[in-house]
Curated annotation (Swiss-Prot):
One of its GO terms (molecular function) is gonadotropin-releasing hormone receptor activity. Pfam families: 7tm_1. Disulfide bonds join C113-C195. The keyword Membrane applies. The chain crosses the membrane at residues 38-57, 77-96, 115-136, 164-183, 212-231, 281-299, 306-325. The gene is GNRHR. This is Gonadotropin-releasing hormone receptor.
């Protein structure tokens, strides 16, 4: 079957925009694997909400017990913002995915189609960027400790920049997502509304570029930065731990990494590992789809659902990680 020309594609998109319909052979339905995905999603939603909210409450109580006027340490401030980002992702991505898989159709209208699509991507950018901030901060803390000590506002600036970039990079979602109505192969309207990006890009490569940009900012760039930072951290830890292999005295002045800092460095490496392990399968599947869209017909729905659910474990694991290293 010959592919449509750009002019034909443009005419088809105009027809979709004017009639608010899209020809589709098979309308989606809620399958057994979809029901399992919904159940697991809401279970992870409860776990992540409880874990992250509990840590925020613990931080609040810890702050109240501190001496009046004494601020949180830089690491605790970073953990607070990572927890807020994880909680935001939990409260937006998980319920939205669960409810949409239940209804299959989009009942929330055009406005919420755009707004929720924006908030979903914003809440995914924020934890990824906050992970970068933590990795950079901890790496600089051991490679340039004096510079970090003299520049107390650097951490706050990086945190603010992470939230700002998350909001800016998610902005296109407000434009490209729209509500359409699907129809069956005969052209009969089924009243099947969906929130999609069909015909939002003038050329196919515009969408390809946007998808690659989003993928890079959500995964490739954060992964690259955290790997470099954590490689420096691991190298420094290894060098220090081998200074005295028989009796390591971390609290003595001859050691340039005290026990508390050593614990936070290990925690940073654990965060990066959790991020990499949880999200890599999901994005590998996405890359595969870009180069071979027919893979959806070869990869079963349970496998697709599993990779997505595995990614949702990341905001659940993070509170457990800083809970473990806080013992």
């Amino acid at each position: 079957m010959a592919s449509a020309s750009p002019e034909q594609n443009q005419n088809h998109c105009s027809a979709v925009n004017n009639s608010n319909m899209l020809m589709q052979g098979n309308l989606p339905t809620l399958t057994l694997s979809g029901k399992i995905r919904v159940t697991v999603t809401f279970f992870l939603f409860l776990l992540s909400t409880i874990f992250n909210a509990s840590f925020l409450l613990k931080l609040q109580k810890w702050t109240q017990k501190k001496e009046k006027g004494k601020k949180l340490s830089r690491m605790k401030v970073l953990l607070k913002h990572l927890t807020l980002a994880n909680l935001l992702e939990t409260l937006i991505v998980m319920p939205l995915d669960g409810m949409w898989n239940i209804t299959v159709q989009w009942y929330a209208g055009e406005f919420l189609c755009k707004v929720l699509s924006y908030l979903k991507l914003f809440s995914m950018y924020a934890p990824a960027f906050m992970m970068v901030v933590i990795s950079l901060d901890r790496s600089l803390a051991i490679t340039r400790p004096l510079a970090m000590k003299n520049n107390g506002k650097l951490g706050q600036s990086m945190i603010g920049l992470a939230w700002l970039l998350s909001g800016i990079f998610a902005g296109p979602q407000l434009y490209i997502f729209r509500m359409i109505h699907l129809a069956d192969s005969s052209g009969q309207t089924e009243g099947f509304p969906q929130c999609v990006t069909h015909c939002s890009f003038p050329q196919w490569w515009h969408q390809a570029f946007y998808n690659f940009f989003t993928f890079s900012c959500l995964f490739i760039i954060p992964l690259f930065i955290t790997l470099i930072c954590n490689a420096k951290i691991i190298f420094t830890l290894t060098r220090v731990l081998h200074q005295d292999p028989h009796e390591l005295q971390l609290n003595q002045s001859k050691n340039n990494i005290p026990r508390a800092r050593l614990r936070t460095l290990k925690m940073t490496v654990a965060f990066a590992t959790s991020f990499t392990v949880c999200w890599t399968p999901y994005y590998v599947l996405g890359i595969w789809y870009w180069f071979d869209p027919e893979m959806l017909n070869r990869v079963s729905d349970p496998v697709n659902h599993f990779f997505f659910l595995f990614a949702l474990l990341n905001p659940c694991f993070d509170p457990l990680i800083y809970g473990y290293f806080s013992l």
